[in-house]
Amino acid sequence: MGKIKIAVLLSGTGRTLDNFVEKIKKGDLKAEIVCVAASRTDCLGLKKAEKYGIPCAGFDIKDHKALSDEINKFVFKFNPDLIVLAGFMKMYYVPENYRFKVVNIHPALIPSFSGKGYYGMRVHKAVSESGVKVSGCTVHFVNERYDEGLIIAQKCVPVYAKDTPDDIAKRVFEAECKLYPQVINLFAENSIEVKNNKVYIKGE
């Protein structure tokens, strides 16, 4: 299995970037992070990318379409195979030539607790208040609507009555740290196929 070239888009602390770097070092993620782009110039994730020696750039642009355009100008210099959203808190407009080459991870089991306004701790607070017994994370393709792209993979975690939103968040992030690299590896293996508006994984 060859390495896949990925561009990482982020807005916050870069926890998922940390996870990717760690997994790559261990040989558990068959990827090369060719660049990092951030929707802010002051976020910790950007500083981490600099520390890791990864080419990076931040953009303070309010308009989502204009932001996507500027990010794409930067990202396309590195010709990534896959664009990976990792805590990217803006709408990203996918270029036509990158259809089914842009993925995101959501901290719940889509279609539950998803869509505009459901991000970060808001998701886990809603899960806690709902009384559901299962939550998890979802890796999906990015399209023109928040969290509505085709689902690629999901991982469940239990939710207990005594859980706080922080408890749920911790458990879900642990699941994310496993699932996201697994899905990226599937792309590296050319094991993902889209047919009839569904995602098929070879061998399943």
Q: What is each model feature region?
A:
Residues 1-204:
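One-carbon transfer enzymes
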